[in-house]
Amino acid sequence: MLEKININGLNEVIYKGKCNNGLIVYLWSSPKLKSTFMSLSVKYGSLDTEYIVNNVKHNVPNGTAHFLEHIKFNEKEGTAHEFFHKTGADVNAFTTFKYTSYIVYAMNNVKDNLNHLLSFVETPYFNNKMIQKEKGIILEEAKMGEDDPGTVGYFGFFGSLFKNSKYRNLVTGNQKEIKSISLKDVKDVYNTFYCSN
């Protein structure tokens, strides 16, 4: 059963439903739009560096959420980017303090693109070789952020404002933290947060 949510002032309606596996789905269709936007968001962000599973406390380095976002694009046969490129869709992702979102914009092949979005996010494929390769890519991204005036200013401000809070940390993690992320960290986080229930 879908719940109907009226968006006041926009004359639009969103439908909300919950799948049997616990996944919450929002649907919005508008005759004004020709393209389709799809987003799958996981309630796991850069603040989630400590968590408890079965009464056992786990700690992962800052930057693990962003690292996992990157590495999820790898598949057993190629990358998610390759699939979406073939269908003419654009795919991207981003990590915030509180969640990670995988997004697809498509004009055609909506069902195939939606199925692949669900598949690549919900199917884990990690190995040590991938972890090491991705570290190099993310370290370069972190270096660029350390040289970007906007990023430096933003997190400098947050560092002053939130001296004793995780909000002071870069979402990407710093270089030392990125280097310390392990295959075990990635697998543990995925198995804890990237499940529907």
Regions found by a protein language model. Name each.
Residues 18, 75, 79-197:
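Charge-rich, well-structured scaffold segments of protease-associated domains
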